[in-house]
């Protein structure tokens, strides 16, 4: 705040007291509203998340971010980070590449496909998150993972995962890949996850279409422990119909569970 005039510093303090926003957000919001305190506070309360995000973006050192990108970029193609660079990035963050945390980062970067980031995805993604170092990103991760408690944000991550995980030229997601990602994203969220995966590997053995992937989340959210509220006449994919038929005897004790 040392570069601000005395009157501006007063407004920053008043803005922070009124909104509980950070100093950085206060300065950004006041600057955007020509230092008019009332207008700035009104704007902030209409969309606090946006102002927080923009103030974070404005704090990123783009030169530092370019240097960070250079650490990871593919030696053969400077416009992307390949699998070796992703591994180094994960090592710097002390993360397992197969962890939910790395998937959350890819989601925030809006990555098109697994095992690589384009330069634009990496630079824009880090800027959007207000990060120009792996240390800042690591510190931010717990808050990003907290966002998944919001059902709408989790649904967005879940639907993103299908496109991210599949081969770019294919419409469906290979079964083994689908099972691996379901274990990652639905563990602790879908009560029939193990039974579903067993059913698929034993009886389906084909790729998973997008609508089946997307609707499984809705199915998992609404289905009763004994499957009694399943509507066979509902607009569920055939694969989910077949699963319910397979699973009912297991969950109601009609035959022994494989678990």
Curated annotation (Swiss-Prot):
GO BP terms, alphabetized: positive regulation of protein neddylation; regulation of protein neddylation
Top-level taxonomy: Eukaryota, Metazoa, Chordata, Craniata, Vertebrata
Record gene name: Dcun1d2
Principal place of residence: cytoplasm
GO MF annotation: an example: cullin family protein binding
Nucleus found in the keyword field: yes
GO cellular component labels: cytoplasm; nucleus
Protein origin, superkingdom: Eukaryota
Full protein name: DCN1-like protein 2
